[in-house]
UniProtKB/Swiss-Prot annotation:
Molecular function per GO: thiazole synthase activity
Reaction equation(s) it catalyzes: [ThiS sulfur-carrier protein]-C-terminal-Gly-aminoethanethioate + 2-iminoacetate + 1-deoxy-D-xylulose 5-phosphate = [ThiS sulfur-carrier protein]-C-terminal Gly-Gly + 2-[(2R,5Z)-2-carboxy-4-methylthiazol-5(2H)-ylidene]ethyl phosphate + 2 H2O + H(+)
Protein source organism: Brucella anthropi (strain ATCC 49188 / DSM 6882 / CCUG 24695 / JCM 21032 / LMG 3331 / NBRC 15819 / NCTC 12168 / Alc 37)
Protein's gene: thiG
Protein name, per record: Thiazole synthase
Subunit structure and binding partners: Homotetramer. Forms heterodimers with either ThiH or ThiS.
């Protein structure tokens, strides 16, 4: 069972809530994904505006946990301020921390990220940092108080999948007891399955579902892929090899 900061969840698929064609399709996609956790952006959803109130009512109706994020923040100060506003509006200490360092790739700023994570952890937040796949940055985030890490698979919205499986595999081996979530860049269900086969605890999907021709069907596809990938990891899959190995025994074979 998936566990974040002492809370347990059945599904290992986290779903973003931005860019869907309509609120109804969003709701159907969340149900199809069987996700227990959805991410929301304070910059997109105001708890005071009517649209924000309608969105919040929809999320409550779905009965899922909410993980607010600091999307669009480029400085530690901006991210910390946004996180505090999110806590007031959504009533949770959880925060998906994003501090963007490059506008073209949306790559996280590792220095600003660690600074903001330290400030938020000291203030009682339970931080989910969106990060690159650097082990040293991961160490600094853990030292700052983070108990979950969210390395990217590829740039946000790119759909490229896992750009550096070696780095992700190394991070999994280096932090066997820290919940790890692949966040960003996943484009199709097979990418999610590959992440789960590496031993990752969960994946976070948004654009790949929201922008699909049929978001509801894609959400279901991701749910199945995440389950399949996790089962493969737990089943201890065979190692790849360069040469063939016969799978059919010779015992009882007729000699001609």
């Amino acid at each position: 069972m998936l566990e974040f900061y002492g809370q347990k969840f059945e599904s290992r698929l986290l779903l973003g809530t931005a860019q869907y064609p309509s609120p109804a399709i969003l709701a159907d996609a969340v149900r199809a994904s069987q996700s227990d956790i959805v991410t929301v952006s304070l910059r997109r959803e105001s708890g005071e505006a009517r649209a924000g109130q309608d969105f919040w009512a929809l999320i409550r109706e779905l009965g899922v946990a909410v993980l607010p994020n600091t999307a669009g923040c480029h400085t530690p100060r901006e991210a910390v301020t946004t996180a505090k506003m999110a806590r007031e509006i959504f009533g949770t200490n959880w925060i998906k921390l994003e501090v963007i360092g490059d506008t073209d790739t949306l790559q996280p700023d590792p220095f600003g990220l660690v600074e903001a994570a330290r400030a938020l952890c000291d203030d009682g937040f339970e931080v989910f940092p969106y990060m690159n796949d650097d082990l040293v940055v991961a160490e600094r985030l853990i030292e700052a108080g983070c108990k979950v890490l969210m390395p990217w698979g590829a740039p946000i919205g790119s759909g490229r999948g896992l750009n550096n499986p070696y780095a992700l595999k190394t991070m999994r081996a280096h932090f066997p007891d820290i919940p790890l979530v692949v966040d960003a860049g996943i484009g199709v269900p097979s990418h999610a399955a590959a992440a789960m086969e590496l031993g990752y605890d969960a994946v976070l999907i948004n654009t790949a579902v929201a922008k699909a021709g049929d978001p509801v069907a894609m959400a279901r596809g991701f749910a199945l892929a995440v389950e399949a990938g996790r089962l493969a990891f737990e089943a201890d899959a065979i190692e790849a090899r360069d040469m063939a190995a016969p799978s059919t025994p010779l015992l009882g074979k007729a000699f001609l």
